[in-house]
């Protein structure tokens, strides 16, 4: 087992990474203060891991809360089901909420924990690659709104993150690829040597090689923790973690939540951010194509939806969380391994980016 630390003073917490950690009662006992535990999971994950985690927590009074699966359920109605269960079982302020699942479960369980009786403890047990390397770390919680993704929520840190890498054995290949979009992101924004390592090891990761997976998760979490330590509430450098997300969130919102997986939309959005960085002269086309090839090798889409027009992107991007005083800001690359958040770009460059022929741009690169 490997352990990293998110250093936030009194709200610091460990990230444990290893195989079969769901069975390690000691990792949970030190972070649970009361006798009541609510395990929030979904219909897909529950048959796989709920009984095991319940057994691990057998010394507590456990309430299972099983939600419908999918991004389309990340809303007020589903959040209310968590509150209904907590109140129905008379959970008090010493309750610990445990999120067992992917990013949707983690975001909603965390938001419920932040809100229930004005805040109870919670622990993240992420079971998808995307949630293990990104959404479980850093305290972002929330739900979607029809007008925008993740627009309602709170910053609320977990007491611990327990990453059981063995859960990836049951993850569909499409979901694994979606998680790789966030892994590749770290190499692009802050760790070019990691990008080089990924180019050499992407096939091992996709074949679930234990050592390669653990290394990728550890390096991703270390990068995320470093950024969160410096900027917990996304007032500065943390926003660089959103490379590709402004374009990607527009895709998710326009196409309908869940039609494109989050990582798939981020991948296509990353290609758009790379193209815009290239248009600005910050990175060369060779660097742009290098990143696109890696995304392709990860099994990810690199072309935005054909049915989306530039105006569709602009309308959705106008409600992005990085918009300040009506000004759109984007995460772009100054160079490989260095990202910047900026609103200082010509409108024409953005329009050229939105209208580019990404099919023609990427088809010659191959997978």
Swiss-Prot record:
Binding-site residues for Zn(2+), renumbered to this chain: 182, 245, 262
Reactions catalysed, as given in the entry: 7-phospho-2-dehydro-3-deoxy-D-arabino-heptonate = 3-dehydroquinate + phosphate
Protein's name in the database: 3-dehydroquinate synthase
Matching InterPro entries: Dehydroquinate_synthase, DHQ_synth_AroB, DHQ_synth_fam, DHQS/DOIS_N, DHQS_C
Gene3D superfamilies assigned: 3.40.50.1970, Dehydroquinate synthase-like - alpha domain
EC number: 4.2.3.4
Top enzyme category: lyase
Keywords recorded for this protein, A-Z: Amino-acid biosynthesis, Aromatic amino acid biosynthesis, Cobalt, Cytoplasm, Lyase, Metal-binding, NAD, Nucleotide-binding, Zinc
Gene Ontology BP annotations: amino acid biosynthetic process; aromatic amino acid family biosynthetic process; chorismate biosynthetic process
Keyword NAD attributed: yes
SUPFAM superfamilies named among the record's database cross-references: Dehydroquinate synthase-like
The gene coding this protein: aroB
Transcription is among the record's keywords: no
Gene Ontology CC terms: cytoplasm
Pfam families per UniProt: DHQ_synthase (PF01761), DHQS_C (PF24621)
The protein's annotated pathway: Metabolic intermediate biosynthesis; chorismate biosynthesis; chorismate from D-erythrose 4-phosphate and phosphoenolpyruvate: step 2/7
Signal peptide as annotated in the record: none
GO molecular function annotations of the record: 3-dehydroquinate synthase activity; metal ion binding; nucleotide binding
Family per similarity comment: Belongs to the sugar phosphate cyclases superfamily. Dehydroquinate synthase family.
Organism: Stutzerimonas stutzeri (strain A1501) (Pseudomonas stutzeri)
Function comment: Catalyzes the conversion of 3-deoxy-D-arabino-heptulosonate 7-phosphate (DAHP) to dehydroquinate (DHQ).
Highest taxon above the source species: Bacteria
Subcellular location: Cytoplasm
Cofactor names: Co(2+); Zn(2+); NAD(+)
Cofactor: record remark: Binds 1 divalent metal cation per subunit. Can use either Co(2+) or Zn(2+).
Binding site for NAD(+): 69-74, 103-107, 127-128, 140, 149, 167-170
């Amino acid at each position: 087992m490997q352990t990293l630390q998110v250093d936030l003073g009194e709200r610091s917490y460990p990230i444990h990474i290893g195989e079969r950690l769901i069975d390690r009662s000691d990792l949970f006992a030190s972070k649970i203060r009361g006798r009541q535990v609510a395990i929030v999971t979904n219909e897909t994950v529950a048959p796989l891991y709920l009984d095991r985690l319940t057994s691990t927590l057998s010394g507590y009074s456990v309430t299972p809360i099983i939600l419908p699966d999918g991004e389309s359920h990340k809303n007020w109605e589903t959040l209310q089901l968590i509150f209904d269960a907590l109140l129905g079982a008379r959970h008090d302020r010493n309750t610990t909420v445990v999120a067992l699942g992917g990013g949707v479960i983690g975001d909603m369980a965390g938001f419920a924990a932040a809100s229930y009786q004005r805040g109870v403890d919670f622990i993240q047990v992420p079971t998808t690659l995307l949630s293990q390397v990104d959404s479980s770390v850093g305290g972002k919680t929330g739900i979607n709104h029809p007008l925008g993704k993740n627009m309602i929520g709170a910053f609320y840190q977990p007491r611990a993150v327990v990453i059981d890498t063995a859960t990836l054995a049951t993850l569909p290949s499409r979901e694994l690829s979606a998680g790789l979009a966030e892994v590749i992101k770290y190499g692009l924004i802050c760790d070019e040597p990691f990008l080089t390592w990924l180019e050499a090891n992407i096939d091992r990761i996709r074949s679930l090689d234990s050592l390669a997976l653990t290394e990728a998760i550890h390096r991703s979490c270390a990068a995320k923790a470093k950024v969160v330590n410096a900027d917990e509430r996304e007032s500065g450098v943390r926003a660089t973690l959103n490379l590709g997300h402004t374009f990607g969130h527009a895709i998710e919102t326009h196409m309908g939540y869940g039609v494109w997986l989050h990582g798939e939309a981020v991948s296509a959005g990353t290609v758009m951010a790379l193209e815009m960085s290239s248009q600005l002269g910050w990175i060369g086309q060779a660097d742009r194509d290098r990143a696109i090839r890696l995304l392709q090798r990860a099994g990810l889409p690199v072309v935005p939806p054909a049915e989306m027009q530039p105006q569709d992107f602009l309308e959705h991007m106008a409600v992005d969380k990085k918009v300040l005083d009506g000004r759109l800001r984007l995460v772009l690359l100054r160079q490989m391994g260095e990202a910047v958040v900026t609103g200082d770009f010509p409108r024409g460059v953005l329009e050229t980016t939105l209208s580019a022929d990404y099919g023609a741009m990427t088809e010659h690169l191959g997978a």
